[in-house]
Amino acid sequence: MITHGFYARTRHKHKLKKTFIMLSAGLGLFFYVNQNSFANGENYFKLGSDSKLLTHNSYQNRLFYTLKTGETVADLSKSQDINLSTIWSLNKHLYSSESEMMKAAPGQQIILPLKKLPFEYSALPLLGSAPLVAAGGVAGHTNKLTKMSPDVTKSNMTDDKALNYAAQQAASLGSQLQSRSLNGDYAKDTALGIAGNQASSQLQAWLQHYGTAEVNLQSGNNFDGSSLDFLLPFYDSEKMLAFGQVGARYIDSRFTANLGAGQRFFLPENMLGYNVFIDQDFSGDNTRLGIGGEYWRDYFKSSVNGYFRMSGWHESYNKKDYDERPANGFDIRFNGYLPSYPALGAKLMYEQYYGDNVALFNSDKLQSNPGAATVGVNYTPIPLVTMGIDYRHGTGNENDLLYSMQFRYQFDKPWSQQIEPQYVNELRTLSGSRYDLVQRNNNIILEYKKQDILSLNIPHDINGTERSTQKIQLIVKSKYGLDRIVWDDSALRSQGGQIQHSGSQSAQDYQAILPAYVQGGSNVYKVTARAYDRNGNSSNNVLLTITVLSNGQVVDQVGVTDFTADKTSAKADGTEAITYTATVKKNGVAQANVPVSFNIVSGTAVLSANSANTNGSGKATVTLKSDKPGQVVVSAKTAEMTSALNANAVIFVDQTKASITEIKADKTTAVANGQDAITYTVKVMKGDKPVSNQEVTFTTTLGKLSNSTEKTDTNGYAKVTLTSTTPGKSLVSARVSDVAVDVKAPEVEFFTTLTIDDGNIEIVGTGVKGKLPTVWLQYGQVNLKASGGNGKYTWRSANPAIASVDASSGQVTLKEKGTTTISVISSDNQTATYTIATPNSLIVPNMSKRVTYNDAVNTCKNFGGKLPSSQNELENVFKAWGAANKYEYYKSSQTIISWVQQTAQDAKSGVASTYDLVKQNPLNNIKASESNAYATCVK
């Protein structure tokens, strides 16, 4: 059987888009049949009462028998020793049911199997010798065996000779049948059937010998989508078929071959089978093992297949920067047909594959452990044509729609049987599908893995004192070159720090601006970085830990970096304890077995110990108890620390009285503008329960409270706000009537509004203050001045490529023509900005080497600029910026003699003028053809 298939596939998300069914005429396949190639595949028949009927699944081995008067199907079954189920399997397409067949009347036809020739000779004919041929009949009607004439025994026998010989045998058979007891109609039908079968027996035998072929040709796109599959029987008996199957396909620009073998075991009503396949993707060098099982019945097929990779990771054939390997998986398939309407069929399949990035639908949509369910229907109006539609729905709401049309031409069947609807039923029976191809996924589903084409590593964490600038060491490996690094420094920015580019030419030159040290709080910040290359690929996320030390701490010092209590209050009963934990690190690394001393700074309480050693995690603990109500402050210190680190104050309370158990401020700094408020929250408890409607009295050393007294709510909380118009530090205290002792909140500080004075910009080269000049000297520097806030500033630039800024000093370096914003953040988290406007022009000295005048002109032209129009233009630059070597970039230059544009007279004379940006010294009549000056360009 040769099958031509044509398919159209559409992919869609949520909705199915319009699709078109591609139809095409099948390609004709012609065979030249050589007698020698299949002489040993002949069927030999003898008709006699001593032989038994054997079933066979090919039409040429079946007999169309006409019932005689008084004869029934049951009579034939008994007399010929044929199971009724066997007769029914051959006649399903002629009768609507088995009972209808049993009622067949005289004159109606019944298909019966022919009998095979037993071995009556010492050996079968040798290849190429004359085979013995007998006509067909039923048991009890013996025909004598006829030997082929010498003319047709030669190995070069032609098809015409074979056909003529078959006709002669048919004529001889006709005369013999007329003399038998069979009726005339039967003799006529038998003679005609045998004659026709003999005429095509050579071709049929060849096709049966070579099994089933299925071809799908796609003419477009260099035949992408085409395939060929071939099933070859090795051994074929009534109850068992052993076969091999080979296939090849060219799909998605990959050439894949399949080689398998299996067995099918036929029972009266069903078939059980197994198969093993090796799949080889020659384009991508992928190998896979497939193991499958089959269970078929009339009008029903099912199969299960497992797929197991035999090759590992290697560079992908068609997916750039990825490795690939076969994905392990399985599928379960069901196909069913309506016995009452066999032209209509249904399909159900589930498939599952395993891996992190599996391309079940396509290589552009990678999924983790994807699965998909497929439902489909097909329609076969005649055996020649089958049309179908499949819908597949999978993981991630992926959808797939497949329209198909197959043209199936069976060379072992007459043309009339391939275009008549009544023969469709035969295709759906177990006997009719005996040689069908194994139902499996012959395409190798692949799993992908991104290659390590870009990696980022930060080998060292950062430890530094507050508000310092620390260089970040980065190690980048990139296949396509580094484009940028994206940082998530939100935790650092929330406290006034940041990660910024240093302004150099390197894309990986970054620095960390450390925020102010938070007394009693966490001073460890987690920052992540991700690198991107020039092709848009990204690296893994890399974590950088930044530890901020107070000014009293020293880098490389073994010191307490965090000191906290497990709660803010406890009972003043001498029993309930508050536990303190001190964390000791050196350059951000926890230090074990370090002695830590503890002291009570204020208040009355008792420590469990005056010192303790750190454990393996760098932590030392101590407990605190008191039998007197009040606030207590405890400190911790290592031997290398010059000053101790205080923890936040805790409160011991009398449980029999309404007491303040907690007081806190929402921030520690604010602007002294009378509007920026700090909110204080006090909690009042008695025993273990909050006290409502309790009056709390507040006092402050600076600023204005929203109220001097507030009553607690149902949860025991009372709140007030504090504002100030005067800069300075403020201490707020709270008290309740039952306890005569004040409870103090953490100290806060008010600052004036942070501003940048854009009219007081200092030019580094001249010391002159004022507005920023509108003509820039590249790499010229200016100092910005901020005022207000807490006086501790962190500077940053929105675009360091235009103008970078020193994070601590506010010194700006001008680099390229453009605009950017400079920001300053004070430790009280105020922010002020200054926008640098695009200059009218940028003076760019090219310091690589001295060049001729014409080379200088070309250099500036390539740069997108031109030479200065005159010496006066450069003189104005000198007046605005001073000597160029006053700036860091030019500090090693003793002179920067620069060409200026020639006048008409200069051009005639071959001379030009120059101007020195370090020493001024304007010169004229300098020979233009010699390398006497630099190319300083105006952009």
Curated annotation (Swiss-Prot):
Stretches the record annotates as Peptidoglycan-binding: 40-153
Annotated region (Required and sufficient for interaction with intimin receptor Tir), positions in chain: 750-939
Record keyword Signal present: yes
Sufficient for homodimerization: annotated span: 40-153
Record region (Inverse autotransporter): 189-430
Residues the UniProt record annotates as site (Implicated in intimin receptor Tir-binding): 889, 891, 896-899, 903, 905-907, 911-914, 919-920, 925-926, 929-930, 932-934, 936, 938
GO cellular component: cell outer membrane
InterPro entries: Big_1_dom, Big_2, C-type_lectin-like/link_sf, CTDL_fold, IAT_beta, IAT_beta_sf, Ig-like_fold, Intimin-Invasin_domain
Keywords from the UniProt entry: Cell adhesion, Cell outer membrane, Disulfide bond, Membrane, Repeat, Signal, Virulence
Location of region: Intimin receptor Tir-binding: 842-939
Subcellular location: Cell outer membrane
Gene Ontology BP term (one): cell adhesion
Residue ranges constituting the Big-1 domain according to the UniProt record: 560-653, 660-751
Domain spans labelled LysM: 63-112
Miscellaneous comment as given in the Swiss-Prot or TrEMBL entry: 'Inverse' autotransporters have an N-terminal translocation domain followed by the passenger domain, as opposed to 'classical' autotransporters which have N-terminal passenger and C-terminal translocation domains.
Family: Belongs to the intimin/invasin family.
Comment on protein domains: Has a signal sequence, a periplasmic Lys M domain, an inverse autotransporter domain (residues 189-430) predicted to form an outer membrane-embedded 12-stranded beta-barrel, followed by an extracellular passenger domain (residues 450-939) with 4 Big domains (residues 450-550, 559-653, 658-751 and 755-842) and a C-type lectin domain (residues 842-939). Beta-barrel forms a hydrophilic pore for the translocation of the passenger domain to the bacterial cell surface.
Role noted for this protein: An inverse autotransporter. Adhesin, which mediates attachment to the human intestine epithelial cells. Necessary for the production of attaching and effacing lesions on infected human tissue culture cells. Anchored to the outer membrane by binding to peptidoglycan (PGN) via its periplasmic domain, thus helping in receptor interactions during host invasion. PGN-binding may also aid in resisting mechanical and chemical stress during transit of the bacterium through the gastrointestinal tract of the host.
NCBIfam families named among the record's database cross-references: intimin_all, intimin_alpha
Quaternary structure note: Homodimer. Interacts with Tir.
Name of the protein in its database record: Intimin
Organism: Escherichia coli O127:H6 (strain E2348/69 / EPEC)
Gene name of the record: eae
